[in-house]
């Protein structure tokens, strides 16, 4: 039918066009059938399907397989190839890598090949990666990316054809450029441009000559004169009249042919036309337009004075060429005709339009540049994020953290455990004893006397003696070296200072600048402040050094040129060269406040007496008098006399008292003219003596006062305090007399409590009424009514009577005023307040003393022990017998007819289970426990906290309850126990099943956790295996009576050396005292 219809249609229309396809009537969409799944009629498709290729399978596929080699081009050949290898090694294991080099020059060409191999799972890559997948990942991740600012291309190169073709192209390009570079250097004759192209001047002028000349020109090819290199011979500046350019001088960047190409790559981001060069420098030429000038300005702003290899590009900008103005001005100047007003207006408006256009171009170029930079920054940031996410390895990061921590700990251990002990051992004074003796340095461990060493930081001894700081024993045993004694040097510029500043107060505290001793070691820094002296002695030494005038801080007039002149009279024994143990070494400065200063320690005086005879024998002089109580400096200089008879004997202390002030004044006046040569020195000396007479009276009184103490107590204890002087006693008497007599009632001498309360005071309404309180001290009833509501007590007298009656019933002595308390429970704090005692740990043994139930059990146990002691029976046997009799009586009472019927019924059920199951008896008992649980309850225990009690009689060997909790491992149990202790949970219920399993019933479990410990328990815990799992079940160890507490032995390990053992509170006769 269809064919007939087509023929008839053709005959009617007389049209040879083919009929339309009905399947294309609706655009090829057929709604009446799903052509994708049913194929009675197919959809018309003009092109075949693009089928997805089959995945390569090495077992079934043929051919070489997917490519595993890639070629990388575009990276900088000057960078280390290891960086490029490290980047591509992150995608898989590299089997082979090759950085292509030039076969002739050996230089790298900037492209390389990487062949990947199949990798096995490792620590860094837990998933295996095939070589084809690694190559695919490398192309997908690195194609078009940057490696150190250079964009690279990554492509497949399965057989190495691409890399070989690239190498051949590089070689061919080198062969083509080599003859061109060498051709200009071959000819040695004159340059071609100097040779005339026509015939010589002597040639004939006829037409033949012309024809012959033309034939010669055509036959001989003369090359066009062009520059032999990139560097132009003619100046370039003559061709840049209007073009904007940037000039870089040759003094900043040397002119070389190879530099132009590098400069073009350096400035490739700027739209320049060309870079030309001559002998003067480089010319970066831009387009003669507003856009070109904008690019020139941008290039100048960005690249001026930047690094170019090892040079600095110093640029000079020329926006309008060498003329320095716009090109349209030059074009308008060439026109000679006069302009019409309209033309003149147009010409005048043209610069403004050009300026506006150039400004718009500059703004557009600036916006484009900002957008481009922003896009590049964002792309770089995203690339950096991807690289960080790709290269992030938690194992490496953890390794770095651990290494840093180990380094810190190692440095800390070396500093504290190795360096510090070694330094302390090296600086130990014992190791430098010989060197100190050789250099005459003091012994740091020797008992230093505070008044002797007045300043440790001076570079000289206190009285300029040779060995005043050396060991006293060494000074006694060493040979006397007279030449080693120091010479008293003059004070530099002493007279100049006197003339400059006028009169100098000899008693002023002008301490000279102290310099460090050359032989000062650092061991004194390591010495403790408390070594060799107490805190009081350190304070006294500090105050003494601060308030007194030390020998080195005295005026230099006493040891100046006057002493230098008299030095020769005594040969090398100067009058001021005394030993450190003589009286001169203890001379203190003359100050107005010496009456209030501390006296010499009695220990120093004892040392003076002990060393007196030895010093006389050592120095060969006789010391007449030794002032024991602050002798003056002048007396100490006069006391050294030539040796006489009996000089080696020790004189009595009483004969060494200081003479009267008049005698000293006379001697000083006689001796002063002989010593003084200048009038100014004499005046200073007289003024000093006048002040000394006032101080000598104070010294005499103190010496007489302490004379008895010196003779009776030769070696007093260091803790004894010096007696007060007469002046101080008189002042104290005057103060006592001056105190006014005050009324004891108004101004009591002792502190009295503001509100005295009786010893039996208790806070109550009646007690408040008994206190002597004023109207302001009584409670404000109006304010109390506002804060609290009114209570309904009906009859007030009845309410008071009922309250007193309750107190009488609760009290032990039947008194309503005695508070209800437990004896021994409330223990007062030593300071009266627990907060004032600080934070301290309370031991378990101390905590158990304050438990009320334990106090009750303790009293019962003491009474029972006392009773057992009277009967002379063993306490353990007596307690066991009593428990057995009580259990038998209770069991006899409990065996009623109902219990016997229940037992028979349970026995019958048990026999049935044994016959059907044939299991162990423990399992049957456990099943019995599931059927009928023993009625138990928990309540306050007399042993500890809560306890579990039996609500009925329980026979022996009967199962009571299962210990239920959370099953955890041993390590988790230890962590939880520490966590419970830190969080304040005092009781943790952990029951061990075996070495690896623990039942934790602290937060999840049954009431079996409340069973307390006892040294004589009535229950026992067994571990049985039910259906493949271990269970903890509590059995009755003996017959248990109703309302009796259930206990079993915790069986803790013994800790005999522990300082905080857990006390046992069971109170039985066989109590061991501790759980652990």
Swiss-Prot record:
Keywords: Chromatin regulator, Chromosome, Methyltransferase, Nucleus, S-adenosyl-L-methionine, Transferase. It is found in: Nucleus; Chromosome. Component of the Set1C/COMPASS complex. Residues 174-210, 325-387, 493-599, 623-744 are annotated as: Disordered. Transmembrane segments: none annotated. Belongs to the class V-like SAM-binding methyltransferase superfamily. The RxxxRR motif forms an adapter helix that bridges the nucleosome and ubiquitin. GO terms for cellular component: chromosome; Set1C/COMPASS complex. One of its GO terms (biological process) is methylation. Catalytic component of the COMPASS (Set1C) complex that specifically mono-, di- and trimethylates histone H3 to form H3K4me1/2/3. Binds RNAs which might negatively affect its histone methyltransferase activity. COMPASS recognizes ubiquitinated H2B on one face of the nucleosome which stimulates the methylation of H3 on the opposing face. It comes from the Eukaryota. It catalyses: L-lysyl(4)-[histone H3] + 3 S-adenosyl-L-methionine = N(6),N(6),N(6)-trimethyl-L-lysyl(4)-[histone H3] + 3 S-adenosyl-L-homocysteine + 3 H(+); N(6)-methyl-L-lysyl(4)-[histone H3] + S-adenosyl-L-methionine = N(6),N(6)-dimethyl-L-lysyl(4)-[histone H3] + S-adenosyl-L-homocysteine + H(+); N(6),N(6)-dimethyl-L-lysyl(4)-[histone H3] + S-adenosyl-L-methionine = N(6),N(6),N(6)-trimethyl-L-lysyl(4)-[histone H3] + S-adenosyl-L-homocysteine + H(+). InterPro entries: COMPASS_Set1_N-SET, Nucleotide-bd_a/b_plait_sf, Post-SET_dom, RBD_domain_sf, Set1-like, Set1_fungi, SET_assoc, SET_dom. Residues 1060-1076 form the Post-SET domain. S-adenosyl-L-methionine binds at residue 1050. This is Histone-lysine N-methyltransferase, H3 lysine-4 specific. GO terms for molecular function: histone H3K4 trimethyltransferase activity; RNA binding. Residues 330-377, 544-561, 683-704, 720-742 have a biased composition (Basic and acidic residues). Its main location: nucleus. Residues 934-1051 form the SET domain. Residues 512-525, 668-682 have a biased composition (Basic residues).
